[in-house]
């Protein structure tokens, strides 16, 4: 059996954030199980988050092919620095809420000219290079992971040139049904072009892989011929040294980004009311947001005299530093996207939340995929945004347990471990032989 597999990914260390970890961990455990993964990734990517701590998980024997990429962000930055005196970050192309004229223009250009995304210029040179590479190295299996969905078009190009290749298209997010597209002011022509590209990938890939049951059903309804589900997960190695300790304050933490689609205010209003109604809660509680937080939510907190005393913001931390925080946390706040397809939203961090053993209180669709996992694992609750009394009851119950020193250890076992998930991926790849 040929155990060589080429993985084509935009996000790779030192890139940080959740997008990199899925395939970083798969590569780690594929290598441990006798497979030979090759990783193809940009030499000079434009990403918003850097995390060098993730480099420790890259197996030294894995060949990383770093190939030059040109992205319009670089040119756009030069233009914006001339006209506005500051650079525009990649995330500004998809900013929600109040936008400057420059941001509106950038989003319109991004949505209607760079289809499926701004990495489209990497497709042809990558196909030309990799067509020779897979033949020289006798690779017969390739995996593309998106977003960015341009990478699936690299896979499509390779498959068309080498019909014997087995191609897995991994969707960490939807494509034509992705809520992000609704923020980009797409013309009808642009949206239809997304759908045509998506259809070609769904029809030509030997397997469509995705991360939630909701997305699995979506892709089946869109006509994908072989859809498989392998969720995200947690790496047991990351949690071996995490020790829970009694906290001097009742500590509620949210880890990750806050934006217009992920709104923690329902939980914050409940905490505010509890502070006003319960003196002991008001004295003991502290809330910490770790990661990028938009100005609207910061303003909401800072303008409230109660919340301002209890809520702090910490900028982005390396993954190894984030892991340490789990041991000094009492409740983890999970904020799910409120959007058309929110039922399928399972943030990658949910699985690390589960592995931490801390109680989870979530905001979002109470019948969605994330809520189902949390409920099945007995790890907490997910409440609808308008359930003010539900949030108050959940926080008060957790606070009572903290006061009594009876905080339960809710750590899940191996259902979502990266090692077990890699076994599922291997079974999928072996089915091609």
Each predicted region: which residue ranges?
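A conserved catalytic-core segment of Leloir-type glycosyltransferases
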Residues: 42-120
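Nucleotide-activated donor-binding/catalytic signature segment of Leloir-type glycosyltransferases, i.e.
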Residues: 284, 289-291, 296-323
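N-terminal subdomain of nucleotide-sugar transferases
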Residues: 1-73, 207, 216, 227, ...
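Membrane-proximal helix-turn-helix segments that form the acceptor-binding/catalytic region
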Residues: 131, 150-153, 157-161, 175, ...
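Carbohydrate-associated surface elements
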Residues: 214, 233
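Acidic anion/phosphate-binding donor-loop and adjacent secondary structure
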Residues: 72-78, 234-249
């Amino acid at each position: 059996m040929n155990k060589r597999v080429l993985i084509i990914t935009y996000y790779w260390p030192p890139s940080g954030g959740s997008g990199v970890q899925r395939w970083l961990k798969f590569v780690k455990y594929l290598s441990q199980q006798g497979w030979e993964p090759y990783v193809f990734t940009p030499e000079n990517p434009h990403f918003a988050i850097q995390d060098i701590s993730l480099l420790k998980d890259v197996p030294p024997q894995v060949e990383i092919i770093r190939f030059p990429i040109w992205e319009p962000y670089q040119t756009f930055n030069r233009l914006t620095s001339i006209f506005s005196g500051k650079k525009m970050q990649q995330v500004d192309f998809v900013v929600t809420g109040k936008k400057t004229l420059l941001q509106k223009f950038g989003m319109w250009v991004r949505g209607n000219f760079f289809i499926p995304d701004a990495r489209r210029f990497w497709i042809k040179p990558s196909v030309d290079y990799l067509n020779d590479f897979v033949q020289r190295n006798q690779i017969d299996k390739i995996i593309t992971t998106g977003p960015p969905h341009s990478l699936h078009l690299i896979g499509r190009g390779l498959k068309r040139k080498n019909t014997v290749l087995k191609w897995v298209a991994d969707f960490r997010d939807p494509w034509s049904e992705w809520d992000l597209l609704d923020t980009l002011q797409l013309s009808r022509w642009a949206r239809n072009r997304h759908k045509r590209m998506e259809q070609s990938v769904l029809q030509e890939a030997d397997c469509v892989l995705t991360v939630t049951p909701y997305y699995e059903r979506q892709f089946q309804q869109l006509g994908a011929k072989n859809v498989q589900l392998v969720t995200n997960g947690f790496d047991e190695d990351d949690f071996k040294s995490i020790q829970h300790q009694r906290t001097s304050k009742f500590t509620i933490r949210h880890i990750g980004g806050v934006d217009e689609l992920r709104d923690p205010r329902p939980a914050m209003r409940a905490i505010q009311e509890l502070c006003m109604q319960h003196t002991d809660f008001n004295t003991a509680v502290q809330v910490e947001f770790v990661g990028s937080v938009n100005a609207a939510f910061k303003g909401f907190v800072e303008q409230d005299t109660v919340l301002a005393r209890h809520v702090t913001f910490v900028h982005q931390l390396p993954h190894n530093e984030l892991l340490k925080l789990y041991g000094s946390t009492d409740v983890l706040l999970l904020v799910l996207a409120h959007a058309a397809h929110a039922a399928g939203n399972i943030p990658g961090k949910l699985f690390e939340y589960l592995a931490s053993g801390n109680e989870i209180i979530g905001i979002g669709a109470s019948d969605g995929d994330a809520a189902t996992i949390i409920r099945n694992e007995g790890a907490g609750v997910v409440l609808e945004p308008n359930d003010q009394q539900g949030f108050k009851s959940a926080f008060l119950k957790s606070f009572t347990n903290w006061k009594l020193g009876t905080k339960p250890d809710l750590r899940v076992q191996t259902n979502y471990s990266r090692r077990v998930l890699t076994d599922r991926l291997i079974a999928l790849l072996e089915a091609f032989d």
